[in-house]
Amino acid sequence: MNEIAFLDLNEISLQSLSPMLSMMVFALFILIVGAIKKDLSRNFYCVFCIIAIFVNLGITLDFNGLSLSFWDMLLVDGISIISQIIILIASALFIPLALSTKEYFEYKIYEYYALFLFMIAGFLFMVSSNNLLIIFLGLEISSLCLYTLIALHNKAKSVEAAIKYFAMGSLSAGFFAMAIAMFYLATNSIDIARIGVAIKDLSLNQNLIILLGCVFIASAIGFKLSLIPFHTWIPDVYEGSNAPLAGYMSIVPKVAGFIVALRIFAMLEGSGISWIKDMLYIIAVLTMSLANIMALVQKDVKRMLAFSSIAHAGVVLCALVANSHEANVALFFYWIMFLFANLGAFSMLWVARCDDVVCWDKRFKHPYEKFSGLIKILPSYAVIMGIFMIALAGIPPFSVFWGKMVLISSLIKSDYVVLSLIIMINSAIAIYYYLKLIVFMFLKEPIVKDKNIYISNVSMALKVIVGVAVAGTVFAFLFSGAILEFIEHFVFASGF
């Protein structure tokens, strides 16, 4: 007779679950309160979301040491803590953008804010597990919320974008589920560490099922990180989303996705599957190069920023190619530096949101011509947007430059000199399309003379967020050393 297996409830460990549980409790509270009292303003929901995020941040910072719980499915280590901090801070910076002067449909309904918190909980699950099933659960929670948030913009293009994202996301989920099945079939485990041990001990690195699992999981991750050739959904989805959500999508989901990729690809390389590194090398080069080339020919600034985010993802992927301690530190540092500049760029697009007067190409919301001669109409806007463009181009002394410098330094230490040169060449290409917007703002004649059209969506909340983004972008060199030490401590503690 088979022995009956008993589950030890002490393994649940509410402390490990507390970041995700608390976020879901806050989201449920919004749903209950919103259903009972329907006249609450978006100010209440935004402030409540920020409080929820900072409570969660406090819980995260309270962790001390490695913790493996929930029947070995939840992992709290340095990698998960630092990624949770980035996700929570980025979320806290983006949610106030809902407090624009114009009241858009999605920001007037309480479901938006509940879905936003549920989405964050999904990202936290993704980065806090070494178990493929829990990662898949977090991936689907966050993705389903994100599809809905995009559609809530209540525009034809938004619904189209949500459907496209849903279709691509469903394909990605299918690939991920197939990968889980393949790995379980070959190793009898869905735990990343145990899969790696089984592949190494049983010499399964040439096993057909394992190879298929690697292909499926690489494809799923490629979709989520918008790596070439899995990038085609990005420009249309960004264009159909409102600017704050597009900016959020360019950072937080990718941070969560890169943590999953870091854990999985490090395991596969360590278990003797050497071709993974070569595959990542090729994809990184293609993603950087082709995305930059496609960004050159864009006529809409938001679409340009979409391809720009793909190119930056290709740059960060180089850290996974090196797979060294320094490169892993550079991965986190790069996303923090990129956060400020990209937050600022998309915030400025949200400031310039104006549907009332259209005197440019009606196919696009943010064509380059919209910003023509802005230095003569609204000098402060032109200067601030110029700072963000220069920063994204990787020009010193602004934030992204320091991220690239640390990453390139780690690649050179790992003897990836050619890859470092490719990053530099692509950075030079990117300068063109970032400076193109600056040329329109500073050297072209204005099309619209009324500055109120450009600032009709401005609010105090937007000014504060833009101010934070400017400060983080311009003064990054002052705190970059402290951030690097902070990241290095957590990455070292995780053994990466």
UniProtKB/Swiss-Prot annotation:
Regions crossing the membrane: 16-36, 46-66, 79-99, 116-136, 166-186, 208-228, 245-267, 278-298, 304-324, 331-351, 382-402, 422-442, 464-484
Keyword Cell inner membrane: yes
Coiled coil feature spans: none
EC number: 7.1.1.-
GO cellular component: plasma membrane
Main location: membrane
InterPro entries named among the record's database cross-references: NADH-Q_OxRdtase_suN/2 (IPR010096), ND/Mrp_TM (IPR001750)
Enzyme class name: translocase
Origin: domain of life: Bacteria
UniProt cross-references to Pfam families, sorted A to Z: Proton_antipo_M (PF00361)
Catalyzed reactions: a quinone + NADH + 5 H(+)(in) = a quinol + NAD(+) + 4 H(+)(out)
Keywords of the record: Cell inner membrane, Cell membrane, Membrane, NAD, Quinone, Translocase, Transmembrane, Transmembrane helix, Transport, Ubiquinone
Keyword flag Hydrolase: no
Membrane-protein topology: Multi-pass membrane protein
An MF annotation (GO) of this entry: NADH dehydrogenase (ubiquinone) activity
One example of a Gene Ontology biological process annotation: ATP synthesis coupled electron transport
Protein location: Cell inner membrane
Family recorded in the similarity comment: Belongs to the complex I subunit 2 family.
Subunit structure and binding partners: NDH-1 is composed of 14 different subunits. Subunits NuoA, H, J, K, L, M, N constitute the membrane sector of the complex.
Record's function text: NDH-1 shuttles electrons from NADH, via FMN and iron-sulfur (Fe-S) centers, to quinones in the respiratory chain. The immediate electron acceptor for the enzyme in this species is believed to be ubiquinone. Couples the redox reaction to proton translocation (for every two electrons transferred, four hydrogen ions are translocated across the cytoplasmic membrane), and thus conserves the redox energy in a proton gradient.
Protein name (record): NADH-quinone oxidoreductase subunit N
Organism: Campylobacter concisus (strain 13826)
Classification of source organism: Bacteria, Pseudomonadati, Campylobacterota, Epsilonproteobacteria, Campylobacterales
